[in-house]
From Swiss-Prot:
Keywords: Cell membrane, Membrane, Transmembrane, Transmembrane helix
Transmembrane segments: 17-37, 138-158, 165-184, 186-206, 226-246, 251-271, 337-356, 358-378, 399-419, 427-447, 460-480, 488-508
Cytoplasmic compartment residues: 1-16, 159-164, 207-225, 272-336, 379-398, 448-459, 509-552
Organism, as annotated: Xenopus laevis (African clawed frog)
Protein name as catalogued: Solute carrier family 22 member 6-B
Single GO MF annotation: transmembrane transporter activity
């Protein structure tokens, strides 16, 4: 880790690193807003068919509605049908529900919405109800598809063109596409701009992540990565505050997008990764950047002693390794032990993200204030991640991973048997499940990095991230299965984490085990004799940088 030694000699975690981390962490607050924004911008208010005539359209409880709208088996007014002609005899007879043989028709004149909680949403803007209600979930899946495409696209581009230019571009793209989404003329254009916003989301996450960890000394990554991870958690609370103040979806979309213009402006000041510059054949530029870091950190004399020759000599081993790498994604399934790890870790990544977004993007189903439930869902991540840290450090990674997933699945399944009237119990179980899933995320980033050997570690992390994105794409679509059976979404969201938790039991434990360097060491762990009594904190330090991306 020669580059890390150079950073230590130039001030370690100095003034420059603090400013650097703060500037790269600020966008994370608003990234949470875009990820979970549809809880508010796509909220579905109470609605019913528009009735021609002089009736009070804004009155959703008036007795006159019984003469105009049929009632469902649950005793509620139909949201998608109306009588072809007013049935005033229903009022006179004081009946509780309509006759089955009365003629009805769909909402030919549109719908009337209750604007008491939401002034405007994409649902009310484009009438995404009744036969078009599935478009709500489709829009979120399209956004998550953009996140997946962005992770694939920017992952390769950042290695070729650098982290800094792509971070600048991603902030600009997030600003522009976010603004365009707010002024979309129709649903199709809205989905297109949301897809591009998702692409930009991944660009910011991946490149700001790399820029952060590649300028931070190894010994300080635990604190900085954890602090940055909590920025996303706090960002969920920022979203609640914005949504509570701004009840119009277009203005809320603007409020969450405009800050990225300021991030774009100051991102020009953030220098390129020094390590990437050296490995890309630009040691002169890297040396200049390091001298600037030394000056800001008050280590000007140490910076003046640094030369291009010293820099290249110190990093010669890393330079040679980057030029001689011959490993590919096929190595994730080529050998039996690594293949088993890849299968089990793919299941855990997919199910964690799948169930997490299945809960986090369906807040209206709990029957309580959407603002209160979002606050609770956001704050539960704080103790969940804290507890997860201690369990993974002192009990074990495998135990932590399996328990959190199984408990999350059980909590979700319990809600199937809890009546809708027991809102407090249902909410408590959902919050507990969401907290377990947040803890699972926290463990996964660490565990995955320790399971794979150094030569394919980043490839393995990429596989996990891809499976998580797939889970995020499918989660909104799985909610549509409620049309088949009302509890089917909960059954799916609950069973998959339990099955994945069981699959996680077949993964090897990595607590106190030195990080493997080669595939052979993973396949034959008995031959790995590198100080088997090493402290559990050593593998943690090597892979703690992954914690920064938790839940993002």
């Amino acid at each position: 880790m020669a580059f890390q030694e150079i950073l230590e000699s130039l001030g370690g975690m100095g003034r420059y690193q603090v400013i650097h981390v703060v500037l790269l962490s600020l966008p994370v607050f608003m990234l949470a807003s875009h990820n979970l924004m549809q809880n508010f911008t796509a909220a579905t208010p109470s609605h019913h068919c528009r009735i021609n005539g002089t009736y009070e359209e804004t009155n959703f409880t008036g007795p006159w509605l019984r003469a105009l709208l049929p009632m469902t088996p649950t005793g509620e007014f139909s949201k998608c049908l109306r009588y072809t002609t007013p049935q005033y005899e229903l009022l006179e007879n004081n009946l509780t529900q309509s006759y089955d043989d009365l003629e009805t028709e769909p909402c030919l004149d549109g719908w009337v919405y209750d604007h008491s909680e939401f002034a405007s949403t994409i649902i009310t803007q484009w009438d995404l109800v009744c036969n078009h209600r599935r478009m709500r979930q489709v829009a979120q899946s399209i956004y998550m598809a953009g996140v997946l495409v962005g992770s694939i696209l920017f992952g390769g581009l950042s290695d070729k063109f650098g982290r800094r230019p792509l971070n600048i571009w991603s902030n600009l793209q997030m600003f522009v596409t976010g603004i365009c989404a707010a002024f979309s003329p129709n649903y199709i254009w809205y989905c297109i701009f949301r897809f591009l916003t998702g692409v930009a989301f991944s660009g910011i996450v991946l490149n700001s992540y790399s820029l952060t960890v590649e300028w931070i000394p190894t010994g300080n990554r635990a604190f900085t990565s954890t602090a940055t991870g909590y920025c996303y958690t706090m960002g969920q609370l920022v979203l609640v505050g914005l949504a509570f103040i701004i009840r119009d979806w277009q203005w809320l979309q603007l409020a969450a997008s405009i800050p990225f213009f300021f991030y774009f402006l100051y991102s020009w000041w953030i220098p390129e990764s020094g390590r990437w510059l050296v490995l890309s054949g630009k040691p002169e530029v890297a040396c200049k950047a390091l001298k600037k870091v030394a000056q800001i950190n008050g280590k000007k004399e140490a910076g003046e002693k640094l030369t291009v020759e010293i820099l290249k000599s110190s990093m010669q081993r890393e330079i040679n390794a980057s030029h001689n790498s011959t490993y590919s994604a096929l190595d994730l399934v080529r050998t039996p032990v690594v293949r088993r790890i890849s299968f089990c870790i793919s299941c855990t990544w997919f199910s964690t993200s799948f169930a997490y977004y299945g809960l986090a993007l369906d807040l209206q189903s709990f029957g309580v204030s959407i603002y209160i439930i979002q606050i609770i869902f956001g704050t539960v991540d704080i103790p969940a991640k804290f507890i997860s840290y201690f369990i993974t450090t002192y009990v074990g990674r495998r135990v932590s991973q399996a328990i959190t997933l199984i408990l999350a699945g059980i909590a979700i399944l319990v809600n199937i048997s809890v009546p809708q009237d027991f809102q407090t119990v249902r909410t408590a179980m959902a919050v507990f499940g969401k907290g377990c899933l947040a803890a699972s995320f926290n463990c996964l980033y660490l565990y995955t990095g320790e399971l794979y050997p150094t030569v394919i570690r980043q490839t393995g992390m990429g596989l996990g991230a891809m499976m998580a994105r797939l889970g995020g794409i499918i989660a909104p679509l799985a909610q549509m299965t409620g049309d088949i059976y009302h509890s089917l979404p909960l059954i799916i969201f609950g069973c998959l984490p339990i099955l994945s938790g069981i699959a996680g039991c077949f993964l090897p434990e990595t607590l106190g085990v030195p990080l493997p360097e080669t595939i052979e060491e993973v396949e034959s762990p008995d031959k790995q004799q590198k100080d088997v009594n090493v402290s559990a904190k050593i593998p943690l330090k090597e892979t703690e940088l992954y914690n920064m991306k938790t839940d993002v």
